[in-house]
Amino acid sequence: GDATFDQKILDAHKLHVAIKVTEELLYDNAFNLENYIIVQFGKALANAEEDAFLNGNGTGKPTGIFDGTGGGHLLNTLAAALKSDDMLDLVYGLKRPYRKNASFIMNDATLPSLRKLKDNNGAYIWQPAYQAGEPDRILGYKVETSAYAPKDGIAFGDYSYYNIGDRGNRSFKQLNELFAGNGMIGFVAKERVDGKLVLPEAVQIMKLKVD
């Protein structure tokens, strides 16, 4: 049947990171520390977003793709070690319209067992990229890895149905007074963001047996 969309309301959840540095280091003209801090804040916030968009439970944070209630549809939970047929089930368990733009998301720790899987003809189902910058593939579909993806799960789907709402720009603030008594300068970076999968059937989740 036709896809049905439930109303999803994006909220504004706060993500923030903070650090302290010595005044001497801050005012050392030989090193552009302030610019370095801003770059590091950007990386830290991006990591926090990635974690939240994959694992968040929707309480004070986005609802992640792997969340058990608001995330992708749980296709199956394996009781034995991963087999190539399980990957076929995951791919074809996703409805055809979503397979066109689908890809896998998994933890790096899942790769060793996946790369050893063979089909019934003895051929590896893992298809390595032959050009720099191109993704590896499984059964013809791109493989994306994340250090934040759970080690006991693989997602397969069209992630364009995951809506992200940014509530204003990232803000960076220098706190000159708060730690002045200790000879320190504080820096804080904040942003407000939310994310939800508006169509859970667009992403399938397979839970793995982890020793």
PLM feature segments, named:
Residues 1-211:
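Structured, hydrophobic secondary-structure cores that serve as assembly/anchoring elements
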